[in-house]
Amino acid sequence: WGPIVAQYVGAALLALGLVGVGVWASSVARSQITAFILGVAVMFVLILFGLDPLIVGLPPTLGTIAANLGVLSHFQNMGRGVIDLRDAIYFLSLAGVFLALAYGTLLGRKLAPGRAARRRLVVGVALAVATLVVVNLMGSHINGRLDLTPGHMYTLSSGTKQIVDALPDV
């Protein structure tokens, strides 16, 4: 049951992130059709960034950045039955960024342009987005995994860890 639970958790986190994109697209566009097209386009780009043919064709630094931005690379582990804290942080921050942008867009329509309240809103939304980006970047250094596969297939055993620790660095 472990891999199935991990896949459901992964699907829920993926849906949460993509719903955030959809809410932002709805807040930006005036028409439902335009919002749908914009949301699908952004989601397509987020999915495209995780595809191997695109990553392989890019220079190594850009390929790493694209892989970290793409939703597929973060969903793959959960599809195998491993819930990684870095992937959960990615999906939560993805939803948070787009929901903050949607909040700023909707509230910005009510405020008069050029007023101090609108400037504070823009600064607040920018700080929220920057904070979520930094949390996502810092979260990539956190090592927290929950291997729900039978026999913990994707976790090193204690004997393997001892052997690897004894290997000389080259």
Regions found by a protein language model. Give the residues of each.
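Hydrophobic/aromatic residues in alpha-helical transmembrane segments
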Residues: 21, 101-102, 131
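Internal/C-terminal transmembrane anchor helices
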Residues: 114-141
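Juxtamembrane extramembrane loops of integral membrane proteins
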Residues: 134-170
